[in-house]
């Protein structure tokens, strides 16, 4: 069942039904198609994979809303193309919903993957800090396999790494800029 945050649904759903955030589905579709998307309400994308394909350019405006995501390779936002993150209203956030738990929850909330992948952060907050940050911290943005990341505005708060970059012995030209 696709539901907006304003929807009135029973507290328990019949077997076989699942409540899915309509805003999360709209976000997923918009990022896959490229262009500009402005969040209309908070969205929980846990269990969903939001991807910007290699041949697409997308802009995500948090518009003062919150995206809740998991730090797993199968969740969160993965950029293979180009993403600009901004927040036109202020107080917009992307937040981690789980503590670090080894490899299962050990990726960035946003992952930039590949030589031609790039992200520019112009505003908003990526919040991956947890209550026990020293032992159960998380990662904000992960840059892999030659991806590029530029931050010109906003902030990243993380328990361990705000921006994480790892190579895998291939020729890579990752660039991380803080402007």
Name each region found by the language model.
Residues 45-59, 68-87, 96-119, 133, ...:
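Extracellular beta-strand-rich solenoid/capping regions of secreted or surface-exposed proteins
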Residues 16-19, 77, 110, 163:
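Short beta-strand element of the conserved SAM-dependent methyltransferase core
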Residues 9-13, 27-31, 67, 135, ...:
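Alpha-helix C-terminal capping segments
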Residues 28-31, 87, 149:
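Short, exposed beta-strand/loop patches in secreted or surface proteins that constitute
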Residues 63-73, 88-106, 122-137, 152-164, ...:
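Beta-strand-rich solenoid/repeat architectures in extracellular/passenger domains
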Residues 7, 37, 43, 50, ...:
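Solenoid scaffold repeats with emphasis on beta-solenoid/beta-helix
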Residues 2-51:
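Acidic Gly/Asp/Thr-rich repetitive segments characteristic of extracellular carbohydrate-active
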């Amino acid at each position: 069942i696709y539901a907006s945050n304003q929807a009135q649904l029973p507290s328990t759903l019949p077997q076989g039904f699942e409540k899915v955030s309509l805003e999360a589905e709209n976000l997923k579709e918009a990022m896959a198609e490229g262009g500009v998307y402005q969040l209309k309400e908070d969205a929980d994308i846990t269990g969903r994979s939001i991807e910007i394909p290699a041949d697409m350019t997308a802009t995500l405006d948090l518009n003062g809303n919150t995206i809740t995501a998991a730090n797993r390779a199968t969740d969160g936002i993965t950029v293979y193309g180009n993403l600009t993150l901004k927040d036109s209203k202020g107080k917009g956030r992307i937040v981690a919903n789980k503590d670090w738990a080894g490899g299962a929850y050990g990726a960035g909330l946003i992952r930039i993957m590949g030589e031609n992948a790039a992200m520019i952060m112009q505003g908003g907050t990526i919040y991956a800090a947890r209550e026990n940050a020293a032992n159960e911290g998380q990662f904000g943005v992960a840059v892999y396999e030659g991806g590029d990341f530029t931050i010109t505005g906003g902030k990243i708060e993380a328990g361990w790494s705000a921006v994480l970059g790892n190579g895998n012995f291939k020729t890579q030209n990752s660039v991380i800029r803080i402007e």
